[in-house]
Amino acid sequence: MKLASRPWLATALLATTVLVSACSDDDDGGNGPATPPAPTNVQAPAVTETSVSLTWNTVTGADIYVVQREVAAAPVVRGAALSVTRVFETVGTPATNAFTDETVTGGTTYNYRVAAVVDGTQGTFSTPIEVVVGAGPKVAIVDEDITADRTFFADSTYVLTGFIHVANGATLFIQPGTTIQGDFEVVGSSLFVLRGSRIEAAGTAEAPIVFTSERAAGQRLAGDWGGLIIVGDGIINRTGPIILEGTGTNTNNNYPVDYAGGDNNADDSGTLRYVRVEFGGYGPLQDAELNGLTMAAVGSGTTIEYVQVLRGLDDSFEWFGGAVDAKYLVSYESGDDHFDMSEGYAGRIQYAIAFQSEVPTQRPGAGNASGDPQSVENDGCNGAGCLLGHASTPFTQPLLANFTLVGPAAGVFTAGSGGYGMVLRRGTAGYYVNGLVARFEKAAYSLRDTETANRVGDGSLILSHVVDAEVGAQFHAGQTGGTFDPGTFSLTPSALTAAATFLALPANPAAAGDFDWTPAAGSEATAGGMSPFTGNILTKAGAAVTATTYRGAVDPAGPKWWTAWTAYADN
């Protein structure tokens, strides 16, 4: 508790003491009042960056207490001797045995002592106690491009103000446990790692690296900032220049970023490990948005593992060409697609979870809500620079293994063409194996257009060993992209609901502990996986992807790889 100080009384007492001393020659030799004892058990039970709260044992008869503070002094030289000058100053004269000093400076060490005043006589001071006042949270504003190697330290929060580019061959190192925020006042503030530069962001399960909103918990929305964008030197199937979606507004350093023309699918743009990207997304134009994590022409030398994207305005993960592999991905409540691959992406992804229960509320002015959200949406080639249209090469041909896709309950996606588990279109190829697709009102799989059917026909597009539960249909009817025979390709319909398929799938999750993605006993996902791989899938997997006897993103025998480092929040 903080009590009113009484400096006037302390001054009066000092004057009285001096007067008594001066007149003592005229007294009759009496002993005078006894000196009050020093207060005992002086403690500082509460210390913040701006205050120190002190308590001590009561001294019998005390009218007030004198609290003094000394800033811990450095040794000084006096002649040939080394000594320490100690200067205490009075900071309070409370009437009770507690006092809060609110004039401290963060990052400073202080010594405190207390004396009692009884009947006008000040007693002996207590032995000083040392109190270290913490420096408090450090905030670093990042408002210009990073063109030389730099480290973001875990003891600081970094605020991206505008569109920040790691460029000129620089490497950005980020320590485990570091928080990076997008400036809420500068819409779309983002971090770009451009071609030839690198990011080394290796967190741990106990100390993940978090990219998030500047707003306080409870006030955060999709689109509060832009996102994390990596541009590599990999190959895409469009001829350029091809300007990255969401760039080129030429405001707040948002200049056009061209990602075409790369020729090295083994390029190395660094590391993302145990990283969360929260409440991002920025869409200056319809169908031209920044995502939670955008990977444009990123090569396979880059490491992407244990990454979560949470409540972004647009896609959670989007790959434009390149061949970067990824493992252990979690997408939670996406504003558009959870996993979007296009323009010749040829990487391998294993262990991926997507969960959707609602349409996220977005920040006004940050962009437009999607009209066709899916869990997986893969395209071959589309738009300017596709010289052969949807048949442009190299084909989009990922390997997606051990995926768990959970959609919203019926009626959540009421408009547009969204709401499918997997949409494969515009000439995409790829291998989709050992998966679990649950709770999609329309259908589990939607294969569209004749060029996609050509990929099915030549064996470069395979959907195999996947369980579907609580879906309106296995295949989207009336499409021309082809289908797969469920018996031949082990596409297994389940009689279980989505909730019964897992150990724990809450309707309104509030914390990581609410989820358990482990398949429940009796679920078809506990078995039936393609193991070993064969044919084109074996060739594509190489040493990067392991065949499993189970289906879905989680081994029934463990580990629960998503725990400790992921987060689940509405705002």
Predicted regions: what is each one?
Residues 136-173, 183-196, 203, 208, ...:
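Extracellular beta-rich repeat passengers
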Residues 116-120, 178, 215:
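Surface-exposed loop/turn motifs at beta-strand-loop junctions within extracellular Ig-like
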